[in-house]
Amino acid sequence: MAHPKRRISRSRRDKRRAQYNAKTKAPAVATCPVTGQSHHSHRAYWFEGSLYFKGRVVMTKEK
């Protein structure tokens, strides 16, 4: 039976798998019900000087 000559490290294996996954999956984009802004899912985003997360203002930028 064929078998590998050298053991493949976890990092090398995961790098190979990451290339395949990056090509096949599109980033998850959500639309905020409050602002109507499109953004990445499960991420906070800035809109008109305020930081939003899950439809709520988390932080406001001071001028």
Curated annotation (Swiss-Prot):
Q: Where is the composition biased (Basic residues)?
A: 1-18
| SUPFAM superfamilies according to UniProt | Zn-binding ribosomal proteins
PANTHER family listed in its UniProt record: 50S RIBOSOMAL PROTEIN L32, LARGE RIBOSOMAL SUBUNIT PROTEIN BL32
Q: According to the lineage, what is the superkingdom?
A: Bacteria
Q: Which HAMAP family match?
A: Ribosomal_bL32
What the entry lists under NCBIfam families is as follows: rpmF_bact
The GO terms this record gives for MF are: structural constituent of ribosome
Gene Ontology cellular component terms for the protein in this record? large ribosomal subunit
Family, according to the entry, reads as follows: Belongs to the bacterial ribosomal protein bL32 family.
Q: Name one GO biological process term.
A: translation
Q: What is this protein called?
A: Large ribosomal subunit protein bL32
Q: From the UniProt entry, list the residue stretches annotated as the region Disordered.
A: 1-27
What are the protein's UniProt keywords? Ribonucleoprotein, Ribosomal protein
